[in-house]
Amino acid sequence: MKWFNTLSHNRWLEQETDRIFNFGKNAVVPTGFGWLGNKGQIKEEMGTHLWITARMLHVYSVAASMGRPGAYDLVDHGIKAMNGALRDKKYGGWYACVNDQGVVDASKQGYQHFFALLGAASAVTTGHPEARKLLDYTIEVIEKYFWSEEEQMCLESWDEAFSQTEDYRGGNANMHAVEAFLIVYDVTHDKKWLDRALRIASVIIHDVARNGDYRVNEHFDSQWNPIRDYNKDNPAHRFRAYGGTPGHWIEWGRLMLHLHAALEARFETPPAWLLEDAKGLFHATIRDAWAPDGADGFVYSVDWDGKPIVRERVRWPIVEAMGTAYALYTLTDDSQYEEWYQKWWDYCIKYLMDYENGSWWQELDADNKVTTKVWDGKQDIYHLLHCLVIPRLPLAPGLAPAVAAGLLDINAK
């Protein structure tokens, strides 16, 4: 039974994409895009986060290029938000979180700034007249504060004034830097962004994870030595969980395959390890995290022996898994990846997709019942594009540039 690149399956994906786009519209607040609750309501107590606002700018840039009425207005809103309350006019960059009363968290976070870069680059593909100016400014901030020429890797965070940085390096922030760098390359055609993405992947995946059974280290010191016991006392941390976060392993795999395709599109020979390590990450994620306790679903985190730590099933790992399955199938034509893709969609429609309240549940417990141990509410809709839109596109260019170029369903029959 074939789903990939069939018009019938792609039509179903498109219907679900529109349902998600419509849910996300509820996130509009004066300061950007807010944190969505389980029924699509704004959770005002959470404030307006840079990472959510930037991700929603990215999402509605894709929607605008798909011809969705009203989406361009949301792109405009997102750009104004990025130039508004979230932006630090004194020291530069963006605050981590604001609300209607002012700044809630003035720190300058790499993770959040890389989403600012992704959102700005995606907005450029819509033709918005202010998007390129926003991208140029964001690149300036990244170059000055978050890309380390000495380390050839990305820094984690700064204080408000960009005067002190952490003695910590994060795999999560660097992974999302790779994601953003790929899209920046697509809109600027500056090869250095691909070179940087390749460098980051080579350190975190090829040098470290490959030699550890593809269990990806998330936490490093400033010399890029893994810190294996980081947050052992706070294992369910949303952004810096203890141990391995298998959803990131499989997400890394997809990003490396986009990088592989981007290099091929330049008529360059990609390093063979990009594909081989992507396969290794995919299978390691299934080995350690899929149904280890008997019930279907990906556990949130595992220890260094692959045993579950936080058994909750958060939605984004399985969403990323489906995108990676498609990417691996595209490059290998191996039917096992489509079989996993279909199995995971069956799981999602059974447990995660919420047709009563909208969007998808963010988190399930070990028995696949709705819970809120790690996440509260449905936040945003960014990850969902990776199982809804990416399976309808070639692997290069990246998501927003490919949609803007009219490449949706180009291979569908």
From Swiss-Prot:
EC number: 5.3.1.31
Name of the protein in question: Sulfoquinovose isomerase
Purpose of the protein: Catalyzes the isomerization of sulfoquinovose (SQ) to 6-deoxy-6-sulfo-D-fructose (SF). Can also catalyze the interconversion of SQ and sulforhamnose (SR). In vitro, can also catalyze the interconversion of mannose, fructose and glucose, but has extremely low activity with glucose.
Domain of life: Bacteria
Alphabetical keyword list: Carbohydrate metabolism, Isomerase
UniProt binding sites for 6-sulfo-beta-D-quinovose: 55, 111, 172, 176, 238, 251, 362, 379, 383
Broad class of enzyme this protein falls into: isomerase
Family statement: Belongs to the N-acylglucosamine 2-epimerase family.
Organism (species): Salmonella typhimurium (strain LT2 / SGSC1412 / ATCC 700720)
Gene: yihS
